[in-house]
Regions:
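Class I S-adenosyl-L-methionine-dependent methyltransferase catalytic core
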Residues: 1-173
Length: 173
């Protein structure tokens, strides 16, 4: 599968960056997702999900069900993952807040909300057992599709700003 890396690695570096456990503690310890379509694998992920797809499963081509948490690859294919989240509807995607990109605007136009996280996520680099953490190279946000995703963020302890997109037709009114 192409484009499954979260960052383009330098010489001798890993290209895998995992969402830290503290993120899910702040999101809500009682929250369990039905699917993580971008999982590094059982035992390597902090995503509380009943079902996972790894890069070998190619989550982008699989059928999604239930509430989805998607920390997609941050390469060129991020827009494809956002489109899959939008088509599914009951999902949240943790992505860089790349407001200068076409994929970001396309994704946000289909979303129910966007939660811009305060600060930068301190991802786990390579393995949750690896103590090395890496700050993201940009700010992150959660793009939210569906009422359940919105409600989770509204009731979370995450710090940031929740914004609701304005429909293009209503923008001029």
């Amino acid at each position: 599968m192409t484009g499954f890396t979260h960052e383009r690695p330098g010489e001798g570096e890993t290209n895998e960056w995992y969402t830290p456990k503290t993120f899910f503690t702040q999101l809500g310890e009682h929250i369990t997702f039905d699917l993580d379509p971008c999982s590094p694998g059982v035992g390597l992920s902090h995503v509380p999900a009943r079902r996972v797809f790894t890069k070998d499963d190619d989550g982008l081509t699989q059928q999604w069900e239930g509430l989805v948490f998607c920390n997609p690859p941050y390469g060129r294919e991020v827009g494809l993952w956002a489109e899959k989240c939008a088509a599914h509807g009951n999902s949240m995607a943790l992505v860089f807040a790349r407001v200068d990109t076409a994929w970001f605007h396309k994704a946000v136009a289909t979303a129910d909300g966007v939660f811009f996280l305060a600060g930068r996520v301190k991802f786990h680099k390579g393995s949750i057992r690896n103590p090395n953490k890496g700050n993201a190279s940009a700010g992150s946000c959660l793009i939210l599709w569906g009422e359940a995703a919105m409600r989770i963020v509204e009731n979370s302890d995450l710090l940031g700003v929740l914004m609701k997109p304005v429909a293009p037709a209503a923008a001029g009114e």
